[in-house]
A protein has these predicted regions:
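C-terminal "cap" of GNAT-fold acetyltransferases
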Residues: 236-249
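Helix-loop element at the rim of GNAT/NAT acetyltransferase active sites that forms part
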Residues: 17-31
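A short beta-loop-alpha structural element at the N-terminal edge
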Residues: 2-14
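A short catalytic or substrate-binding loop motif that flags glycine-/basic-rich loops and adjacent residues
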Residues: 42-47, 234-236
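Catalytic micro-motifs at enzyme active sites that drive phosphoryl/nucleotidyl and oxygen chemistry
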Residues: 36-42, 67-69, 102-107, 228-229
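Acyl-donor binding region in acyl/amide transferases
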Residues: 84-224, 229-238
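Short, His- and charge-rich active-site/binding loops that engage polyanionic ligands
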Residues: 47-106
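Short Pro/Gly-enriched beta-strand edge/turn motifs at strand-loop
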Residues: 31-36, 224-226
């Protein structure tokens, strides 16, 4: 099942899943509070909607679920954080603005309603096309309900050495660069060049194999990518800017 979290308890379960994936499985460095609570939490959680994929056939096996008199709950196996422009504007802006200069893109598209996608993760055994399709179906329903014109966000490649990621970064730079008016540039202090290999040195097939499933999914749907990558040392990742105007979404994905 895919739906929005409706209670604080469900948001906490999404935060626990994020902690498991980002901190325990990958190499993110938790703050003391995150390590204590075993949840990935930040100020944006309070102003975002949280999309959940729930497996009703599986139940939580955490100590919390085995307390006397507490009902066993279906397992949250995937999540996405959704931030609408009106919520961002009335609080502290988009999370992405901490890595990319998105103001020129916003100015080039006056009146467009933007939705930021972030903090996406899926529990390891569920990293299948089916789960990605469920998340996409949930996002697409949300986009239609709120009349969103374009989606934006940061997508991550694992690792903090851009030279080891030269092939996928160069592929995105040469073959999937956002058009003028939709292309955000990494902030000057954080800018890492993506064109580490010449266009003719990029083997597209090998590059696609080196990309994480989420970025491959974005490419399939019709997303394009910004100018420059950003190294996020806390999360142990190299981030790229992704943008997807609704008008650019491949027709076959609109029918979900």
């Amino acid at each position: 099942e895919v739906r929005l979290a409706t209670t604080k308890s469900e948001i906490r379960r999404a935060q626990r899943l994020r902690y498991r994936v980002f901190y325990e499985e990958m190499s993110a460095v938790p703050t003391g509070m995150a390590a204590l609570k075993r949840r990935d939490v930040d100020a944006y959680d309070a102003i975002c909607d949280h999309l959940l994929v729930i497996d009703h056939a599986a139940v939580n096996t955490t100590p919390f679920a085995t307390k006397p008199f507490r009902r066993a709950r279906p397992k949250v196996v995937g999540t996405y954080r959704l931030l609408r422009q009106e919520a961002a504007d009335s609080h502290f802006g988009f999370y992405t603005a901490g890595e990319y200069d998105i103001a020129p893109m916003m100015a080039a598209n006056p009146g467009a309603r933007f939705l930021e996608l972030g903090r996406s993760c899926v529990l390891k055994p569920y990293r299948t096309k089916r789960t990605v399709e469920l998340l996409w179906a949930g996002i697409w329903a949300y986009v239609q309900h709120h009349r969103i014109d374009a989606m934006l966000g940061c997508a991550s490649l694992e690792g903090t050495d851009p030279d080891r990621l030269a092939l996928p970064l160069s592929f995105l730079h040469h073959h999937a660069r956002a058009a003028e008016g939709w292309c955000a540039r990494a902030l000057p202090k954080r800018y890492v060049a993506m064109d580490r290999l010449a266009r003719e040195a990029v083997d597209p097939k090998a590059a696609l194999q080196a990309l994480p499933p989420l970025i491959k999914g974005y490419l399939r749907v019709g997303a394009t990518f910004g100018d420059g990558a950003v190294v996020d040392h806390q999360f142990g990742t190299t981030d790229v800017f992704v943008v997807l105007p609704v008008s650019a979404i491949a027709e076959r994905y609109r029918d979900h």
